[in-house]
């Protein structure tokens, strides 16, 4: 389909007895950011390697920009860029020299490679540092330069495999801004990440992957709705009163975080739940430091969908 940049039907990949991809299905619309979330070992990096033709699938129909990744691997490579988890830069060279080198490796002529390097340095706000060696760059600057290198050939589809791992908040924000500008220019981005905030900030749609399969897909708001919509959080003054509060509050599905003296539960009628909780606590003489309504976070969605909630326990 003309409006679909990536099509995956029934992708399978084995490593010995382990299925890294187990019948995975995926659709990514052209000109969007599609986030792929999942715990370690879920199959995210294997998926990126298959889509970028670095790894041959065992089964399935997989197309990128209308080309089959097995039968038309070369055509796929001409249309994609890849930013892996580890930087592919020469620290002894300057930023401009690195980009020129990537250009020559992609068979650009010397003049075109220099021009493209200058374009990308300007685009990623690195023009003033182009002569500095990469060793002198901050983490965020290195990652932006690495991202620029992946765009030397002006790809239709860009794969970002955990692009901000190890960066501080400032560095992550710099990369996020760069990704937003790419999509504004029409590039399709497939983003794998372990930062839930990153997917919430960048992704138009999100696929949650576990055990080699997509177990949920939608916008961030759609996925958050799957955990029960709105939630109410109650922070008590005394942790010792958590059990009593759970027993008397007019709520179901309550979770308890003892360290934070926090009770949390899904609600359907926001105002009725809020007034009911405040009234019940007052009548029982239980002091609350804070009572608030909120939407569920993407972290809670992730833990709920993957069954990996180790931080909170269902109240008995």
UniProtKB/Swiss-Prot annotation:
One of its GO terms (biological process) is daunorubicin transport. It catalyses: daunorubicin(in) + ATP + H2O = daunorubicin(out) + ADP + phosphate + H(+). ATP binds at residues 38-45. Its EC number is 7.6.2.2. It comes from the Bacteria. One of its GO terms (cellular component) is plasma membrane. GO terms for molecular function: ATP binding; ATP hydrolysis activity. It is a peripheral membrane protein. PANTHER family: ABC TRANSPORTER ATP-BINDING PROTEIN (PTHR42711), DOXORUBICIN RESISTANCE ATP-BINDING PROTEIN DRRA (PTHR42711:SF19). The complex is probably composed of two ATP-binding proteins (DrrA3) and two transmembrane proteins (DrrB3). Belongs to the ABC transporter superfamily. Drug exporter-1 (DrugE1) (TC 3.A.1.105) family. Part of the ABC transporter complex DrrA3B3 involved in daunorubicin efflux. Responsible for energy coupling to the transport system. Confers self-resistance to daunorubicin, an antibiotic produced by S.coeruleorubidus. The efficiency of DrrA3B3 to export daunorubicin is probably lower than that of DrrA1B1 or DrrA2B2. This is Daunorubicin resistance ATP-binding protein DrrA3.
